[in-house]
Each structure stands twice: as C-alpha cells, then as structure tokens.
Amino acid sequence: MIHYVTPDLCDAYPELVQVVEPMFSNFGGRDSFGGEIVTIKCFEDNSLVKEQADQPGAGKVLVVDGGGSLRRALLGDMIAEKAAKNGWEGLVIYGCVRDVDVLAQTDLGVQALAPHPMKTDKRGIGDLNVVVTFASVTFRPGEYVYADNNGVIVSPSPLKMPE
C-alpha cells in the first residue's frame, strides 16, 4: 500500500492537482489512500454504495456525492468491511458515516463530513459513474483522487509520490 502525502503531491504537481475544500475528516483505518475515481450520486439512499462495495475495487476510490446531507449515514461498518474485503482503496463521501469506531479499525480509507447514527432508506435511487461536483471540485470517473489527514486532492492522471 502506497502512503500518499497530499502536501508533497501538491508541491510536485501544482499544475495538475485541484484541492477539495477542507471540510472532510478521516474516519477510516488508513491514514492515506488514493486511486482511480468511481462515482456515485445519491441522496440519503446508499443502495449503490452497497452494490459497488460488492464489486472488485483494487486501485479504485469510490467518490460519493451525497448532496452534503447531514441527516443520514451513507456508509457503516458492514458496507465498509465489504469494500475493504473487495480491495477498494477508500471512499470520499460528501455526506455522513456511522459505526465510526469500527471504521477506524477497517483497512479502508474513509473521508466524510461527519458521523451520524441513522442509516439510509434503500430505495435503489442514485446514479453510477456520472460527473459530480462538490467542495469546489469536479470529480470525473477515471480521474484520480488522493487523500490523507491534510486533505483531499484530484488529478486528471495518476500521480507518483516524489522521491
């Protein structure tokens, strides 16, 4: 597993990276993560998050545009454990998570807005692999996202940590 340091990536690739507004906190067991973007757009319904966690995710990060809702958690321990088991590098969630003590022990990167104890309704509503924009950055499927305790950045191409 590669350890990413977003300040070093910003210094090495200033013309490539976009910095996501600093509103996210680390809830996962990995201090840093990065990979190819897979997007989901959903609102208070994590059906697609659950479906994608069941898919192979090596080298990929699930970017979830939850509309910034602070009323429901889009990720909990069971989905996070499935995502980790299926090789996902992490998730960036414009929304909330729950079971935060378990998430902190799970081998998965998780950046989200806040904890919230209430689960979502599963109605099967949402869009997969669409362009999403939040926190002043546009996330496109197939581009790359990197995250650590300093922040979240996006690049159109993969970045290597400087020597």
UniProtKB/Swiss-Prot annotation:
Ranges in a coiled coil: none
EC numbers for this chain: 4.1.3.17, 4.1.1.112
Subunit structure of this chain's protein: Homotrimer.
Lineage summary: Bacteria, Pseudomonadati, Pseudomonadota, Gammaproteobacteria, Pseudomonadales
GO MF: 4-hydroxy-4-methyl-2-oxoglutarate aldolase activity; metal ion binding; oxaloacetate decarboxylase activity; ribonuclease inhibitor activity
Pfam families membership: RraA-like (PF03737)
Role: Catalyzes the aldol cleavage of 4-hydroxy-4-methyl-2-oxoglutarate (HMG) into 2 molecules of pyruvate. Also contains a secondary oxaloacetate (OAA) decarboxylase activity due to the common pyruvate enolate transition state formed following C-C bond cleavage in the retro-aldol and decarboxylation reactions.
Family to which this protein belongs: Belongs to the class II aldolase/RraA-like family.
Binding of a divalent metal cation, residues: 99
Protein name according to UniProt: Putative 4-hydroxy-4-methyl-2-oxoglutarate aldolase
